[in-house]
Amino acid sequence: MSSLQRSAPASQNVSLPLEQVKEALGEVLNALQSPTGSARLEEARENSGNDLGKVLQLLLPAAVQIQQEVLQNYGFSPDGEGVLRFARLVKSYESQDPEIAAMSSKLKSFFLPPLPLPPHAGLSAPSS
């Protein structure tokens, strides 16, 4: 097993350089888009409908589990805490690297359903 794939104790903070974060993020996205990952997420989406509560109960845990399976290969604990630590690490690199920012945005789209724009009732367009 390479040093990249050693598991870190859950209490250990994992720090990866930018390129490894990009690699891990790419693997997470690939896992979510794989036939198996897509099927798991689609089933959760169908069972959730447009109910945000059900999205949190069904879709979010499925997506987190898929991430855990990848992130443990990068030394993160295979639990929700490992996913949160990775999310914080990604966030710290978003402003430094536009590719990481774009990949992070794509990752978030797996968790959050598209929200409709709120109506702008009572607001009129400025007159010229």
Curated annotation (Swiss-Prot):
The keyword Iron is assigned to this record: no
Compartments, record wording: Cytoplasm
Entry keyword Zinc: no
Pfam families: P_C10
Main localization category: cytoplasm
The species this protein was found in: Xenopus tropicalis (Western clawed frog)
PANTHER family: PROTEIN C10 (PTHR13463:SF3)
The family this protein is said to belong to: Belongs to the UPF0456 family.
InterPro entries: P_C10
Name of protein: Protein C10
GO cellular component, one term: cytoplasm
Keywords, in A-Z order: Cytoplasm
Domain of life: Eukaryota
